[in-house]
């Protein structure tokens, strides 16, 4: 997200980190948290100053974020393939249960994302897209990721059988 940084900083005008409505004494922690919550949208780049839907990299940025969210937040966590999640096993279990219980819905969302990407790019081939904003690039391959979704589901089901 363009307003959230790896080091934990949050860029919001009400925190005096950018031009715009700045901090006043009448604001509370609730108003700050509500502002932070409001920036979580399907198009986070729209929160960047000077960026609109017609910016040349708007769609590419959005597509990279959408695809990486599928890969990282779903597959990496549910597959538990990253050691960084070792301290969060109780949350990984919740994510796995959600993944299994909502698998068909997730595949449906995945298919919608794939179709939107294909319409935008006028093809269905694997393609690397780049975005000058933040110098991002990503190889978009929904076909492979869909296969990975199915493999991860099978792996989880096998692990659950082994535990019982």
Set out the residue ranges of the language-model regions.
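Charge-rich (especially acidic), low-complexity segments
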Residues: 46-164
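E2/UBC-UEV (E2-variant) core
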Residues: 1-44
């Amino acid at each position: 997200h363009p307003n959230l940084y790896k080091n934990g900083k949050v860029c919001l005008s009400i925190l005096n980190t950018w031009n715009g409505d700045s901090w006043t004494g009448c604001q509370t922690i609730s108003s700050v948290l509500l502002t932070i919550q409001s920036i979580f949208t399907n198009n986070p780049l729209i929160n960047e100053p000077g960026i609109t839907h017609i910016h040349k990299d708007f769609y590419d940025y959005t597509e990279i974020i959408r695809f990486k969210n599928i890969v990282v937040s779903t597959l990496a966590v549910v597959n538990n393939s990253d050691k960084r999640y070792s301290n969060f096993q109780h949350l990984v279990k919740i994510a796995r249960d959600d993944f299994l219980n909502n698998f068909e819905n997730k595949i449906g969302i995945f298919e919608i994302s794939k179709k939107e990407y294909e319409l935008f790019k006028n093809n269905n081939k694997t393609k690397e897209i780049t975005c000058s904003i933040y110098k991002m690039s990503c190889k978009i391959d929904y076909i492979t990721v869909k296969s990975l979704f199915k493999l991860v589901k099978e792996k989880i089901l096998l692990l659950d059988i082994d535990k019982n």
